[in-house]
Amino acid sequence: MPRITKAEMSRLLPVYFIMGSNNCTKEPLQVLRDALEGGITIFQLREKGEGALTGEKRIDFAKELQALCKEYGVPFIVNDDVELALELDADGVHVGQDDEGITSVREKMGDKIIGVSAHTIEEARFAIENGADYLGVGPIFPTSTKKDTKAVQGTKGLAHFREQGITMPIVGIGGITIENTAAVIEAGADGVSVISAISLAESAYESTRKLAEEVNKSL
């Protein structure tokens, strides 16, 4: 399989759902199925933090989520763990600035999808030059899901990436809700990534559907 093109990547980013077992109050597999039914376009397993599964339980959980994504034809991305991504033959991996370096990740992952979190123009350019397929930019708004986040950038911070000539597909990250999705897309993002807006929603299906509507209205 050749590397994904910019146009193909940008079509996968509109509703990017990130979840681990510890992000849900309901059964995680049902939450993911409801989100898939509602229209998520890409999924990332982020099984880390307090209460996260480890060892074989983590691998088994990942396989179950991956199988669901395959059923719906939605790419399955692994957060941070390149070895797990390779073991599962996942569609790709997402790495932060404190995770394994992009050059090493690209060598290991071949032509799979690689996303990189970028907080500055310099980080973005380095990621692009060394093989990133998309950038996760944020946090756009304050978030309670991640405890180790950088300073909030706002939609102006996201727009700055575009103003500086960054044409790589971008997904906005951090504190995104149905209500502020349109502003993120209008600032230049190809999509929004959410955790709690879907994982803790009363109806993951309805929340996903509304997020997709907001993105599509603004693209």
From Swiss-Prot:
Q: Does Phosphoprotein appear among the keywords?
A: no
Residues annotated as binding 2-[(2R,5Z)-2-carboxy-4-methylthiazol-5(2H)-ylidene]ethyl phosphate: T143, S144, T145, G175, I195, S196
**Residues holding 4-amino-2-methyl-5-(diphosphooxymethyl)pyrimidine:** Q44, L45, R46, E47, K48, N79, S117, K146
Tell me the residue numbers annotated for binding Mg(2+): D80, D99
Q: Which Gene3D superfamilies match?
A: Aldolase class I
Pathway, per Swiss-Prot/TrEMBL?
Answer: Cofactor biosynthesis; thiamine diphosphate biosynthesis; thiamine phosphate from 4-amino-2-methyl-5-diphosphomethylpyrimidine and 4-methyl-5-(2-phosphoethyl)-thiazole: step 1/1
Alphabetical list of InterPro entries matching this protein: Aldolase_TIM (IPR013785), ThiamineP_synth_sf (IPR036206), ThiamineP_synth_TenI (IPR022998), TMP_synthase (IPR034291)
Give the record's cofactor note, including how many are bound.
Answer: Binds 1 Mg(2+) ion per subunit.
- Recorded family membership: Belongs to the thiamine-phosphate synthase family.
What organism is recorded for this protein? Bacillus mycoides (strain KBAB4) (Bacillus weihenstephanensis)
Q: Name one GO molecular function term.
A: thiamine-phosphate diphosphorylase activity
Q: Does the keyword Magnesium apply?
A: yes
**EC number assigned by the record:** 2.5.1.3
Keywords, sorted A to Z: Magnesium, Metal-binding, Thiamine biosynthesis, Transferase
User: What are the BP-aspect GO terms?
Assistant: thiamine biosynthetic process; thiamine diphosphate biosynthetic process
Q: What is this protein called?
A: Thiamine-phosphate synthase
**Reaction catalysis annotation:** 2-[(2R,5Z)-2-carboxy-4-methylthiazol-5(2H)-ylidene]ethyl phosphate + 4-amino-2-methyl-5-(diphosphooxymethyl)pyrimidine + 2 H(+) = thiamine phosphate + CO2 + diphosphate; 2-(2-carboxy-4-methylthiazol-5-yl)ethyl phosphate + 4-amino-2-methyl-5-(diphosphooxymethyl)pyrimidine + 2 H(+) = thiamine phosphate + CO2 + diphosphate; 4-methyl-5-(2-phosphooxyethyl)-thiazole + 4-amino-2-methyl-5-(diphosphooxymethyl)pyrimidine + H(+) = thiamine phosphate + diphosphate
